[in-house]
Each structure stands twice: as structure tokens, then as C-alpha cells.
Amino acid sequence: MPPRPAQEVGLDALAYWGLEFGFNQKTGLGVNPESPGRIPTRSWFATHYRGQFRGGYTLNAAIGQGATTVTVLQLALSYAALANGGTLYQPQIVRAVETADGSVVQEFSPRVRRRSIGTFLPARSNSA
């Protein structure tokens, strides 16, 4: 039988890593109302589905479907963290404020929300 990583890891572990990558929380960008999204846990399903938990919920969550909701910005930030080695940055729109002649009035440095999310996938052997 092929490996079933989502079921082996479980829904709560998937939710934990979702939180590490900035899901289920507002990004703090500060423009317009913002949704934190939702990365469901077993307790969330117990509350919202009258205590009934089915294994398929884990599979749906693993592929971002079912009760999982995320914003486009959350998704972009998580991809950036994957690409840069595990640092989740606070999103910002402005890098610097300049006068009409190009003089810098104020600069905004990148701010780290979480550093070194780390490796969470087990190493796979290529030998058969």
C-alpha cells in the first residue's frame, strides 16, 4: 500500500504546521479588514460537526480543501518561507518613503515574524 502521509501525520499536526507558516492568523498588513482564515483541528470539527470526525477531513485539509480557508497573502507568505529556508516575514507594502527629488525620508526594514521554521518532512531514501 502506498504511503499516506496526511493520515500518518494527522490533522492536528497539519494544523500545527499551518500555524507555523502563518495560517489561521491575520498577517498584520494593516489594510482593509482581513480574515485569519481557518486551518481546522480535531477540536474544531468536534465543535462544528457535533463531535463527528471522519478520516476524510484530514485528507481534505492536507490538500487545502474542505473546512480549510486561507488568504492569497497567507499562501504567498508561506511559499516565500519555503523558498527562503524557513523565515516567515511580516508583509509590507512600502520599502521607503522618498521626497520628489528622491531623498529617502524613511526606510522600512523587513521584519521577521518567525525564524527558521525548519524542516518538517522526513528524509526519504532513494534506495529500493
Range-by-range predicted roles:
Residues M1-A128:
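Beta-lactam-recognizing serine transpeptidase/beta-lactamase-like catalytic domain environment
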